[in-house]
Amino acid sequence: MRVCVTGFNVDAVRAVAIEETVSQVTGVHAVHAYPRTASVVIWYSPELGDTAAVLSAITKAQHVPAELVPARAPHSAGVRGVGVVRKITGGIRRMLSRPPGVDKPLKASRCGGRPRGPVRGSASWPGEQNRRERRTWLPRVWLALPLGLLALGSSMFFGAYPWAGWLAFAATLPVQFVAGWPILRGAVQQARALTSNMDTLIALGTLTAFVYSTYQLFAGGPLFFDTSALIIAFVVLGRHLEARATGKASEAISKLLELGAKEATLLVDGQELLVPVDQVQVGDLVRVRPGEKIPVDGEVTDGRAAVDESMLTGESVPVEKTAGDRVAGATVNLDGLLTVRATAVGADTALAQIVRLVEQAQGDKAPVQRLADRVSAVFVPAVIGVAVATFAGWTLIAANPVAGMTAAVAVLIIACPCALGLATPTAIMVGTGRGAELGILVKGGEVLEASKKIDTVVFDKTGTLTRARMRVTDVIAGQRRQPDQVLRLAAAVESGSEHPIGAAIVAAAHERGLAIPAANAFTAVAGHGVRAQVNGGPVVVGRRKLVDEQHLVLPDHLAAAAVEQEERGRTAVFVGQDGQVVGVLAVADTVKDDAADVVGRLHAMGLQVAMITGDNARTAAAIAKQVGIEKVLAEVLPQDKVAEVRRLQDQGRVVAMVGDGVNDAPALVQADLGIAIGTGTDVAIEASDITLMSGRLDGVVRAIELSRQTLRTIYQNLGWAFGYNTAAIPLAALGALNPVVAGAAMGFSSVSVVTNSLRLRRFGRDGRTA
């Protein structure tokens, strides 16, 4: 079940309180609160859990005192993958909203789906919540601005008349307690929890001005109703503009949700039945016509079509799909009729995983924000102390309590840490959202900082720098042997292997029309080769190390042929029988077109580039020379890749590992920054820090550039927010800033931070990075 909550979108403490409170409800298995996206995901058993109890627990958690909340980060900040989603046993998506003036949550509404499993629900979420947020503030803007100007005008133009003060009071009263009610309520809730936030400062400042002016209305002193009214007017205007801007920042998830198909054509006993997509189950057959979106992840069982996978990979070139090929939900069938057997539905589809990953990243914090959090924890009490000291100083030293009160109110208003609270989450939200549009899935704040520090990029060779489409180029036979005989023996042994080289050997035998003899007793030697029994005798197929381990006799002319092939960048595969090598196969892989360009761009960024491979040194060196890589780690077994990455780290290098996310998974985890390329599988998403849905290598450069640009934006935002408060508070304390000007400046600072973050939406457009 997913619940959308308002009121804690910048409060990690509330998120932890919600997780702790909801986890105690019967039937709840796990709770993840995402403070940055104002959502809570609950995994529970429908037969045991009570939805009303869950919603009640969330409401209760809003008022848990801060000192009773465990000092930890929300669970959502530590999520490394999406495997837990598979534990969902049922549920529906709910939307919970607490509009101003309503103490109890609205009745949760069904957003689609069946109790049997998780569903995406309405594609308008979270955009719906943002529209609700804007509806909250816009009427208050229309109320506060005219009345605030009326209060100002009554003081400026009719101050000499006795009724002017009462007119200002009448105009300010609804502004203070109607337009400003969400702010006052927020301050009261914080006070109940013995905490404080930006609402506390605004409420204290405006109430001080309002109460003081009300007293002076009877006592005959100066009035500041216009100050209170205009401050609230500018604050609610700022909140409205902020909601509009952050709505643009959070569009990524809404756009992703809108990509999915809403209906599917289900094949039941040969008949077509149009059903909602959430009714399709694993194993069902669905028919997809030209122009339709493929509704679920699956495997093509019949038909041929070009499929637009740009939503998944970021590449605009259609991909040809035939029987046996896998397809992803939300991709578009362009020109053929396909029958697809569903292999993943609902929360298990690639699109759902992408949505969760983006949501996780947007709910995450960058380590740089820890400083901001520590400062914010003491910021509000410190500002209140400065305001009190300001009033006392003006009263005792300057003997001007009226100026002291004005300066104190200005201090409270100008110091509102809105910009500080928005600095990091808005940048992460926009940056990760733009990355998702480009097929770059970033796992949040920790990844951003790692991207800044890396100085070495290590590429796996097969499937990363190369296409992983091996083919046999040459067959060199020993004395008294024919090339076809050697190829038949090798194909027999490799017929039980799933290795790309083995598949290439078997394919070559089929292409030549050779009859492949039966083989048994297969034994794979990890990273070296394969042994099997063919025609009653042992046959060995593998690399030079396997030849040495098996003590096979290697004729000189075959050894020389192997060296020649390796120097040409090909892999030499030895075939052994009856204690000696009887032939050598040359297997080649083609380098990706953009490999050399990408390596050059990484060098231009000041990064060292290395290649890691199980190939022998000569073959590896030939490939490395072709793409411009200077450092080669050759003859590395799959299980030793982690050790090689660790060795580089021990040398003081900060390493990014780029691999296919399957056999490279341990090395991806070991690296300071793991980048899985060309795959959207669970393994890739779980193991890597960045997943590139496209197989194009330039995604590596774009991922690093986007991460670094996002981090720079965070630093810019924090610098502006800290600098703004550092400069403005002394000016306000000295009386150089009118409280009304302070309120406008406070709103401007928040909008400026969000606007700066929105610049990231231009990343990658027309060759620009931001």
From Swiss-Prot:
It catalyses: Cu(+)(in) + ATP + H2O = Cu(+)(out) + ADP + phosphate + H(+). Residues 103-130 are annotated as: Disordered. It is a multi-pass membrane protein. One of its GO terms (cellular component) is peptidoglycan-based cell wall. It is found in: Cell membrane. Induction: Induced by copper ions via CsoR. Pfam families: E1-E2_ATPase, Hydrolase. PROSITE patterns: ATPASE_E1_E2, HMA_2. GO terms for molecular function: ATP binding; ATP hydrolysis activity; copper ion binding; P-type divalent copper transporter activity; P-type monovalent copper transporter activity. Mg(2+) binds at D660, D664. Disruption phenotype: Mutants show increased copper sensitivity. Its EC number is 7.2.2.8. GO terms for biological process: copper ion homeostasis; detoxification of copper ion; response to copper ion. The active site is at D460. Keywords: ATP-binding, Cell membrane, Copper, Copper transport, Ion transport, Magnesium, Membrane, Metal-binding, Nucleotide-binding, Translocase, Transmembrane, Transmembrane helix, Transport. The chain crosses the membrane at residues 141-161, 164-184, 193-213, 217-237, 377-397, 402-422, 718-737, 741-760. InterPro entries: ATPase_P-typ_cyto_dom_N (IPR023299), ATPase_P-typ_P_site (IPR018303), ATPase_P-typ_TM_dom_sf (IPR023298), ATPase_P-typ_transduc_dom_A_sf (IPR008250), HAD-like_sf (IPR036412), HAD_sf (IPR023214), HMA_dom (IPR006121), P-typ_ATPase_IB (IPR027256). PANTHER family: ATP7, ISOFORM B (PTHR43520), P-TYPE CU(+) TRANSPORTER (PTHR43520:SF8). Necessary for copper homeostasis and likely functions as a copper exporter. Also required for full virulence. This is Probable copper-exporting P-type ATPase V. It comes from Mycobacterium tuberculosis (strain ATCC 25618 / H37Rv).
